[in-house]
Amino acid sequence: MSILRAWQYSAPQRLAGAFKLAASKSAVYRLFFGSAAYARQDAVRLSLSVRLLSWLTGAAARPLEGAAAAIRRALPGSALLGRLRRSGLDAAPPLLSGSVTARALVGLRVESCLWLVFSYILLDYALRAAPGAGSLASWWDELLLVFVLVAWPLQMALRGRITWRLTPMDLPVLLYLAVAAFLFFMRSPATNVALEGARVYAEYMLWFFVASNLLLNKNQFRALFNWLILLGTFIGIHGVYQYIIGVPIPPLWIDASEATLKTRVYSIVGSPNVLGSFLVLIIPVALSQALAAPDRLARYYYLACLTPMTASLIFTYSRGAWLAMFCAFAVYGLLYNWRLLFVLGLAAYAAPKAVPGIASRVGYLMSPAYLLSSARAGRVARWNKAIEVWQNHPLTGEGFGRYGGAVAARNIPGSNYVDNFYLKTLAETGILGLAALALLLLSGLRCALNACSRLSDPALRSLAGGIIAGLTGVLVHNGVENIFEVPMMTTYFWLLLGAVAAMPYLEE
């Protein structure tokens, strides 16, 4: 206690406090944590684009509200409702009236679909592994998104009012969609390829609006994120199991010069890099819960969840994921407690000594042999090629889906992955597309930081910091992989960003 008191009154602590106070008043702080003029509620409500959009949605909603009002007026006197009242759930047979399942079904709302979206990694694997799933395995997430976007306004209409939350992301999303539409019509040599390529960018950001509007209270929020942490724990345990048994992997996953590396884990995801990115997203969330746990038992639980996830992240041997995790921890330390940066430094120093595989992977990355190999036929060569392709059409690029990603690999002969989502975007959509995407992503981080700064609950503020750290890690990982081409990762990114935006509005 005396050491803590001495630190509180020491010159370094006072200097740190003064620096923190000055930083909170600085222009840089306002840039990241403030609210842009275009994103303030009055600016959004009075802007021409939002007024036009509100008029259009209002015109479409009026008939829906009228129909819902008629249904509400008719229901009290209906024969069906009278029959249900006479033979309601409480008057039903004991087997049914006492059924947890039956009562859960009665309480279902559109918000319940969030459990399915948060379970994306599990549902997607189950459907793809299930015999006879067919096209459902490829389209289930789109069908779920369409269902939510249709059922949500219907539910609001039946409740008597159609409304939605305005967020600082509304105008940046509209701007990006406008730029994407312009580029689509300007550069689409093959419409089917362009549609598939544009879908990678435009479709999944709709999950932002689903999360920002359907998250209603703190209990729902905490339950969903605890479930996500539990999912991450199971995935981590499975990854550790794969490492123990030495799961076989394709030879291309290991460079010929790394003979000591025998396996890389991928769990149910199918790719070590994508598994690493998923864990980068979840680990800071679990860490935030551990640090803000209300009691010792809860802290031990979250630390137990962190252990297999961290081990599995190491065993992916994904250098890009390690870099992303380092950046995510640094962001969380800056947001939650700057003293964690010292712990991060110690961990970065000790990790290569504790796990020799880390030292060999990072050491090989810095070796002349790797740089020569990468420049000849590896990642650096693909990056240079992407820049050459961009130079053919600097402003608008080659067109959506025509270079550097999964869509191009399926449809364009000779196309390879760029292993850099931003260079892929530059090659496909030019300066216009990359600038619009950069503005969108930076606006998303600013929206999240602004929401975090408005929270008064320390536990929620810590959780928001963990989510923001994970999101930042995924953005960093996109610099060396095409992470946003994976529907699961893009869905989780926009879903969690929408969740942070909703946090200041959550009810008790």
Where are these regions (language model features)?
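Membrane-embedded alpha-helical segments of multi-pass membrane proteins
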Residues: 137-154, 198-207, 275-283, 323-330, ...
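Aromatic-anchored transmembrane helix interface
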Residues: 140-143, 148, 168-178, 191-213, ...
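Membrane-interface helix-loop-helix junctions at transmembrane boundaries of multi-pass membrane enzymes
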Residues: 104-111, 153-172, 289-305, 333-343, ...
